Amino acid sequence: MARYIGPKCKLSRREGTDLFLKSGARALDSKCKAENVPGQHGQRRGRLSDYGLQLREKQKVRRIYGVLERQFRGYYQEASRRKGSTGENLLQLLECRLDNVVYRMGFGSTRAESRQLVSHKAITVNGQTVNIPSYQVKAGDVVAIREKSRNQLRIAQALELCGQRGRVEWVEVDLDKKTGTFKSVPARSDLSADINENLIVELYSK
């Protein structure tokens, strides 16, 4: 499956906000001007149409969670079939991805690194190795680093970074055992206010 491997800063500049694609100290900073779009001359972004706003919001969320278009549309379709708010359902499906849960627990410094840990079979769910980043974690599931992978330096560094930025309330982590419990699916109020999921619903509803 194709994935973007270019400069992460360029994606954050395109969306005009930090997408948290880099680990802690290397996140979007003064050297990466978010008010300017990528390009040789770094032009300031102009006013967007309603469609443009909807498209940019969809791209922003897609890039935050590292999901390609076809899979993202599949999440939207699943969200629309569920009871309740389609936008909230969409964000919850993305939050329940195993690679995202690994990131939220602090085992990976970024979602991309967390996805790699999953793909390389360094993660277990309820004692069973799972190497599918899109695996949907359920409330009560126990996610852990496999014993032979627990001494990796990058995991120790990621846990330190997570301690600095703060861990979310819907996961509980045992730092000594390098295990975590996904306590519950987060409510919309628990998630970033910087995301306007209604714009995404409007885009796909056309």
Curated annotation (Swiss-Prot):
Q: Which protein, by its recorded name, is this? A: Small ribosomal subunit protein uS4
Q: Supply the source organism for this entry.
A: Pseudomonas paraeruginosa (strain DSM 24068 / PA7)
Any one Gene Ontology cellular component term annotated for this protein: small ribosomal subunit
The S4 RNA-binding domain, residue ranges: 96-156
This chain's function reads: One of the primary rRNA binding proteins, it binds directly to 16S rRNA where it nucleates assembly of the body of the 30S subunit.
Protein family according to the UniProt entry: Belongs to the universal ribosomal protein uS4 family.
Q: Which UniProt keywords apply?
A: Ribonucleoprotein, Ribosomal protein, RNA-binding, rRNA-binding
Q: How does it assemble?
A: Part of the 30S ribosomal subunit. Contacts protein S5. The interaction surface between S4 and S5 is involved in control of translational fidelity.
Q: Which cysteines are joined by disulfide bonds?
A: none
Query: Which processes are annotated in GO (biological process)?
Result: ribosomal small subunit biogenesis; translation
- Lineage per the UniProt record: Bacteria, Pseudomonadati, Pseudomonadota, Gammaproteobacteria, Pseudomonadales
